[in-house]
Amino acid sequence: KDPRDRDFLGEYEDCIEMVMYIKQSFDVPIYYNLDANHEARWGRYMAGKAPELLGLKLFSIEDLLRLDEFGIKYIKDIHHIKIGKLPVIHGDTVFRFGSGVFPAKRLFDKVKTSCIASHVHRSSEYTDKSPITDEMSTCWTTGHLMHPNVDYAKHTDQYNQGFAVIYKDASGDYEVHNKRIYKGKVR
């Protein structure tokens, strides 16, 4: 995006508003923010532009996003977490060189087990079944929650808005609902 067109305060307020909306819309016991490439970009920016501020808690990404205030657990320096038995990754390590035509299939090819990832801003699902063990694995990638007409992605029309809702039971079994947002409606 052209830096002259940036409205950092407006973008920041939009981000906080989105976090509040998510918290109000979904009644779940705990929310997580998994540190990934976006947070790393903030760290690189601060190190290059304002290194003297790096030690101040006020300028940490978790304080800027008010994660404690919103009851969101910040997870840093961890490749993945699990919701029940389902591994959850951001995907920046798996999709380092792009996601290809079918991101969920590419995810499966990399992790070889059921998993859900974001990062590619595209909803997809791929299921595979082992002919040896009869085990079935499914991988999902989720859409994004940003504005649908971002300047940096004009080269692609494959991005879609979306998110996943994951239910788990006491045994760790899970159910994934990979939602898309199309024309303002959750589908």
Task: Label each PLM-derived region with a short phrase.
Residues 30-37, 74-79, 177-181:
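Acidic carboxylate-rich catalytic motifs and surrounding loops in phosphoryl-/glycosyl-chemistry enzymes
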Residues 48-87, 91, 98-102, 113, ...:
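Active-site-proximal loop/helix segment associated with metal-binding centers of metalloenzymes
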Residues 24-27, 68-69, 82-83, 107-111, ...:
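Flexible, charged surface loops at secondary-structure boundaries
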Residues 1-68:
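Core catalytic region of metal-dependent phosphoesterases/phosphodiesterases
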Residues 86-179:
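Conserved beta-sheet core of the metallophosphoesterase superfamily
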